[in-house]
Amino acid sequence: MDISRAEQRILHHLAQGGRIEIKREGKTIAEIRCFTRDGWVYPGVDLELFRKLKRKRAIRSSSGRPYRITERGLYLVRSELDNR
């Protein structure tokens, strides 16, 4: 299954140790933030992209914690060179 360039970027940040945090107002999602492993906020996540990643089972949250990448997500993400 192919993934878009934006999905690829987000999954790569998550594979390196990032997380996606959501804030809710009642049952609706009010805000979505993607944090890199260094704690910086990555601005490329919106509600549509978040739902696509959930639908593809690339990210998952357990016990109310932030969303992390799954094994399926690691399979979908193509490796990239990291300059660290």
From Swiss-Prot:
Q: Note one Pfam family from the annotation.
A: YjhX_toxin
* UniProt-listed InterPro entries: YjhX_toxin
Family in the record: Belongs to the UPF0386 family.
**Protein name per Swiss-Prot or TrEMBL:** UPF0386 protein NGR_c10980
Source species: Sinorhizobium fredii (strain NBRC 101917 / NGR234)
